[in-house]
């Protein structure tokens, strides 16, 4: 027990010294301490350096709740120093997958190049992905599914045993909304169904899912509450902390 207490005190002292060094370096300027000090490589605490985040908005409604929630996440991430890009699947030009399976052996889609390849490249370059989708028949909207169908070769590779994830090391947040109120949105697998579909894609691709948000009852409660907004901010906070 004595050694454990000594180890804890040693760690506390080390962390305190780091804080003192950063405070002295930036002369007590808390804005610079956060953006430059705690995000620098010299800091060994829990906050991770800024990175690239790609937001995939599966909602066709740019002023809907999904778009609002993703907007809050974007604002919070940019405030913390991340580079953020957003893609609206409804704006993409993507032809349907034909199921020819040629991409599994060639490592690329043999159909004419369109936005599916462009977004895939953005995903490959990102450190984290945020997927947001309203519930359509207990699933994600067709526009979003269409895009992911065409990207499978860049997200997982077939092997003689289990699929090999190609997005390993990247993090992910999933959010969904539906008209069905809580708890029926979960019990009847409405928003939960959309989350399940996105989780399946993320899991086989190798993403580490750090947070999921489900918001039911969008007809009865069409405005975001402060609690909803706080959940979005907390998800970004968790994204920054989880390695």
Regions from the PLM with identified roles:
Residues 14, 18, 26-34, 45, ...:
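Glycine-rich phosphate/pyrophosphate-binding loop and the adjoining helix
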Residues 57, 88, 213-214:
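Residue-level recognition of beta-strand->loop/alpha-helix junctions
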Residues 60-61, 91, 179-180, 217:
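Short, glycine/serine-rich, charged loops/turns that create anion-binding
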Residues 51-80, 181:
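N-terminal beta1-alpha1 ligand-phosphate binding loop
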Residues 83-93:
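A short beta-strand-loop structural module common to alpha/beta enzyme folds
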Residues 3, 8, 13-18, 22-25, ...:
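Helix-loop-strand module that forms the ligand-binding subsite of alpha/beta enzymes
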Residues 93-123:
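Cysteine-cluster motifs in flexible loop/terminal segments that predominantly coordinate metals
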